[in-house]
């Protein structure tokens, strides 16, 4: 089954409607690649421990735990970007609720960790919300 793009007249002048999915994919891939640079040692420790139960989750966060969640977050962003692209091709615009969730996640994260990438979530969420409008 082939997905046809929506009628061009309904999305005239809305170039951003085609950018949300690819930008999410780009941020997700960047996240995964950055995980390899920032967490090379902890990821190596996870691999050398045999993977099974290699990440301790106790009262204190470990480097292995941070590496795991940082990498998983990147993969989830890639998945979200793929879903956004497919939905944009099929429906022509995005539903607003995931955009609001991205803004909320970014805001909460930026409050807790102001020097972080959580600001990117707010930007992507705002773009998503813009792309949800008719």
Locations of the language-model features?
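Structural signature of transmembrane alpha-helix termini at the membrane-water interface
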Residues: 33-40, 79-89, 107, 111-114, ...
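N-terminal signal-anchor transmembrane alpha helix
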Residues: 18-40
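Short, Lys/Arg-rich, polar N-terminal cytosolic tail immediately upstream
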Residues: 1-14
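Juxtamembrane membrane-water interface segments that cap and precede transmembrane helices
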Residues: 50-65
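Hydrophobic alpha-helical transmembrane segments of integral membrane proteins
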Residues: 97-130
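A cytosolic-side transmembrane-helix exit/cap motif
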Residues: 39-46, 64-65
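Residues within membrane-spanning alpha-helices of integral membrane proteins
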Residues: 21-28, 74, 99, 106
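Mid-chain, well-packed structural core segment of small domains
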Residues: 67-102
């Amino acid at each position: 089954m082939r997905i046809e793009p929506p009628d061009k007249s309904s999305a005239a002048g809305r170039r951003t409607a085609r950018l949300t999915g690819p930008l999410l994919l780009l941020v997700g891939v960047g996240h995964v690649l950055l995980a390899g640079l920032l967490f090379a040692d902890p990821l190596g420790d996870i691999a050398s421990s045999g993977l099974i139960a290699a990440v301790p989750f106790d009262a204190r966060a470990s480097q292995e735990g941070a590496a795991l969640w940082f990498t998983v977050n990147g993969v989830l962003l890639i998945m979200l970007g793929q879903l956004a692209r497919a939905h944009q091709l099929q429906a022509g615009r995005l539903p607003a609720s995931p955009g609001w969730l991205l803004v909320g996640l970014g805001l909460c994260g930026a409050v807790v960790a102001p020097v972080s990438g959580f600001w990117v979530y707010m930007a992507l969420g705002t773009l998503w919300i813009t792309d949800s409008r008719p």
